[in-house]
Each structure stands twice: as structure tokens, then as C-alpha cells.
Amino acid sequence: MSRLGHFTGVFRVCGWGLGCSHGITYRFVNTLSGAESSPALPLKAENALLGALDMSSIEPTVYDLTAPEMEGRGRGTPGNARARAYIVSRLVNAGLAPLFEGAFGQPTFLERRGGSPYAVNVGAYLPAAKPTAGWIALVAHYDHLGVRSGSVHPGADDNAGAVAMLLALGDALGRARPPLRRHVVLLFSDAEEPPNVRTDRMGSAWFWRHPPFPLTTLHCALVFDLLAGPATPGARDAGLADVIFVLGAEASPGLARLARGVPPETSVEPLLLGLPLIEAYPFIPWRRFAQGDYHGLREQGRRPFLLVTGGRASTYHTAEDTPDTLDYAKLARVTRWVTRLLVHAAEDPRDLGWTDMVADPLADARAILRFHASTGNGSQFPWLLRRALAADRARVQALLHAWEAGAAPTAAEYRELTLIALRLQAALWHPAGWWFALW
């Protein structure tokens, strides 16, 4: 075992040319890189819920949510209101209970009596076997960019696919009605997209500040975004077409146990990553950039959560994010895996625990190398970027070799690792985008 397993010191993640006093403080752990737990056996409720799933509803739901009359579901628009009404009707038909004192909608920032809210969250839940039970929350934002520069941005992958998945799960919960240990919340948040992301104006941030249940009784939140984008040819060639990224499990052994303990689903490969790998930006080492609806929970509620995502496709935040581009077969497989995750989270008898500002460098390095295989021979990249990616891979291999041999990671090394991860994400998102993937 590396000395990391016994290391309890604190490092500041610094940027090039900047003093450590300006960096983010992470405590290095081996939560993910330590001994792995074996997948749990399927639970009775898990099999019942899987049997009640109707995968044929997912694709039509995505088409409904991206229809022209939805106008890209921009916050505060008629199209957003139509999408919200559609979601509410589905929850009513599923037989789920309204989450907000008899209502399915939660207005945010209602400035004056009779005024218009800034955004409206939608929520429903399946009651647990006992009224005094704790809660788990499954979260997917339903808003998108609306109309930008005269073009409707349909937002199929972002985030109609995840919404369709949760609605299919809601239908299954209503049909099977398994007597779970915890109440199961389905939250469809509003105002996730820019300019609201990472601000208190996010619908989910409002929800975490004004929860309909004591936040101390939240067992965990599972946040879903960008689940159905098509895999790149390199990812398919490397056997990574069904990879989904599960982020945040480094925060506690309980979360790691939960994420790793989900029984396997055909071809779905959950790749556990540390949140710092998606929250770093070049030249801004003193700030972390949250990437979704866990932001408010982390800042306000400080309860356990996982972010589950497929990552950005080339259509991300463009008018080409249309329903015909999604991989529905993959989304169906991911839905089955998420169903298993949901049941195991709802039935877990132990407190998960949660600690902020931790990182597992060994696990992150291994995950980067695993996904780096999707770059293939690099022929799709400009030569400068291809050279940088090759150098990055060699550097991660060298760091991992040193750490596995017993060297303790340093602040500068981990900052380097996060920027290597950022370059890999940027390169795979836009292979020709060398102007923002090189620094």
C-alpha cells in the first residue's frame, strides 16, 4: 500500500506562478484507491422495480420534451411552463405524492404576493414503509437554454434524457410501490443553466435551502445530467461506449461502498472520479467550479451526494443537441443501473457520512488513464494537441508509478493532475478545439 493510505496531511492545490496561499485546500485520502468492496446481491425491491420499468417510454418522452412548442425550455418562458406541466402530468399519472405541501411545484424567489417566481422546481415522492423514515433524492434539471441567437436549443442530452429516465423510474415506482426503507424523492429542478449555474438562483439551490423535509434526514442525493450523448468512435473502440462517470464518492467510505456495491448491469461501466477533476480551471487555482445541481447541497446542506453523468458530447449547448442524436439503448442500460443504485441507496441501513474538500490522487490517476484510451491514436486531434495529450498520459503514468511505490502526492502534482483531466475532457468534447485545450 502507498503511504497515501496512512496520510492525513493537508495540501493546497496551487497554480503555476501562484503562491500556495491562494490555492484550494484538499485533504488526500484513499477512499477509492483502497481495497474495493464487492457488488451486493440484488434486493427483492430491486427486482420488483426493474420488472416494472417500461423502457419504451424513454425515447418518446425525450421527443416530447424537445418538441418545438417547448422552445428549448428556457427558464421563465412559456416553453419551460409547458415542460413543467408535462412533467407534473406524468407524476400524477404515476400515482406519486406531491412533494410540496400538496403541490408538485415549488416556486423560487416569489418576490411579492401575486408576483411571478424566478423559477419553479417540480417534485414528487414515493412514501417509505414508515412515515418517520429518512429520504433519498434523485435530481435532474428540466430547464435548458431556450432560444439563443435565433436558434432553439432543444437540450435532448442536456437534460431531457435524464428527465425521461426519472419519469420512467417514477412510473415504475408507482406501479411496483416497493416498501422501501426511505422515502424516494424525484426532483426536477429549474434554473440550472447559465447564468444561474453556481449561484443561489439555481432552482436546486433554493430547494436545498427550503427543503420539504429536515435536511438532516437526507440519506443522500443522486444528481443526473448528460446521460445519453453518443460515444466517440475512440470510446467505442476502447470498449468505453457505456462508461458513466460517478463523482463524489471520494467524500466518504460509505459513498464509495454504495457506488461500488451496485450489482453490475450489462456493459455499463461506472467510472468513479473525484469531483476536483471536473471543477478545476486553468489559472484560477483558488476556486472550484461546481458542475451541476449538487452545488447548493454541498454549500448549504452538506449531506452526501453523487453526480452521475456521461460527460459532454460534441452537441453540448448547441442547437444540434436534438433527440435523434441520443443513444437510447445506452440510456436504457444506464436506467437499469440507476434503478439498482436507487434501491441500494434507499435500503442502505448505515449512515453514509460525508467530508468536503478531499481528493484521492491514486484513484483519479487510474481513472484518467482508463478514459485516456478513448483518444485512440490521436489522429482526430491537431498535432499540437495530440502531442500534449501524449505527454499528459506519460506524466500521469509516471505520477501513478511513484505514488504506488510509496511516494506521497504533493499539492503541485495534484493540481497538475486536475489540469490534465481538464485538457482530456476539453479535447474529447471538441477534438479540433486546440485553442482552449492548450495552456
Where are the regions that the model predicts?
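Second-shell loop/turn segments in exported
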Residues: 44-52, 68-78, 110-113, 148-159, ...
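Extracytoplasmic/secreted proteins, especially bacterial periplasmic and envelope-associated proteins
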Residues: 57-60, 64, 78-93, 103, ...
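Acidic, Ser/Thr-rich low-complexity intrinsically disordered segments
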Residues: 351-430
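Acidic/histidine-rich catalytic neighborhood of metal-dependent amide-processing enzymes
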Residues: 115-120, 146-252
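Solvent-exposed loop/turn segments at secondary-structure junctions
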Residues: 70-72, 91, 114-115, 130-131, ...
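Active-site-adjacent substrate-binding region
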Residues: 102, 220-221, 226-357
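A non-catalytic alpha/beta surface segment that caps or lines the substrate-entry region
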Residues: 61-64, 72-127
